[in-house]
Amino acid sequence: MEVFSRSNPYRGPVKGVVLDWAGTTVDYGCIGPLSVFVEVFRHNWVEVTIEEARAPMGLSREDHLRAMCRAESVARKWEDVHGAPPSEMDIGNMARMVEAHLAYTIAQHADLIPGVVEAVEALRGQGIRIGSSTGYTSDMMDMLVPAVEENGYRPDSIVCASDVPAGRPFPWMCYQNAINLEVYPMAAMVKIGDTVADIREGLNAGMWTIGLTLTGNELGLSEEEVAAMDPEELRRRMDNIEQRFRNAGAHFVAQGLRDCPAVIRDINELLAGGERP
């Protein structure tokens, strides 16, 4: 393996990508997990909205629950019912309930987002290895991956939050993907995802980042809902999502994974000119 240093910078090409799962490659709109979080809070006599459940998407299950419980609206609802803020014991109990139900739910949302198979083929045609990271646990992925494989997608590496010391926004899943794929340096890799947590994960790992504005959690609409939406309203929402990604530090934005092979060609040009992420 060739070694690169500051005196001998890497000038491309991109050799590996790390793709998110729900909202990036499967489950258009990232619909699958939401009902589980809503039901788990309901089991504790607390009614949360889909928007409150969606906001922390991309984090590990326990971190997702902690983020929900820190939200002022959710914390207030919990205190109104229980007389005190949710404790770590409460969060742990809810996390176990989420894991018990989520594995079966996400397996029912294994349909590939349109264009994923073609995009992955195009990336592999450029000599790029396909990694992936997810806030789901390995037990959950054991339910999801076989269904996704039947639909034509299998990454070269799958790393779960439960496989590393901490999930997003920490970089450990990206580093483990780099090891699994045998790709170095990190400037030769691109993180692609549909949440701000994905962008922060990639930046913390020293990678290029692409945020997806149409197919994922930030827009949060099914393919049918997107088709039915007024085009001007859709553009307004996507512009807002793009701005959130830019504010988080994303190098590029795209509507979906199908657009990313062209973006990566642009990244190759930047690398050839001596640019770094």
Swiss-Prot record:
One of its GO terms (cellular component) is cytosol. It comes from the Bacteria. InterPro entries: HAD-like_hydrolase_sf, HAD-like_sf, HAD_sf, PGP-like_dom2, Phosphonoacetald_hydro. One of its GO terms (molecular function) is phosphonoacetaldehyde hydrolase activity. One of its GO terms (biological process) is DNA repair. It holds the Pfam family Hydrolase. Belongs to the HAD-like hydrolase superfamily. PhnX family. HAMAP family: PhnX. This is Phosphonoacetaldehyde hydrolase-like protein.
